[in-house]
């Protein structure tokens, strides 16, 4: 595989075990989409997402699915893993988490279309599912 143009992917080659402690500290990295002339869908399935309840600070568990059609840039998966991990000690409502992820993807990758779905485990007998989208598919 051609490595040219991937020098900016600092997290992929790093063996360091210092993880970001908040979404604001985390860094999504991107690489050039060599097939930007066509529409194709990229899907990240992240079944082990955790964050904290903003009221009780108890852990919330869920699955995050991110589907997008890239334009000129694609999000690198290790940076996404570390970014999502950074929510582990972050106090947020589920709706806020999903929209935050969507906003951060839009800012860094500028996809043609994106959908972020959060399916959260029941707390108090109620499961919460949140879907946020942007753009035309």
Which ranges hold each PLM region?
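N-terminal intrinsically disordered, cationic/polar leader segments
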Residues: 1-137
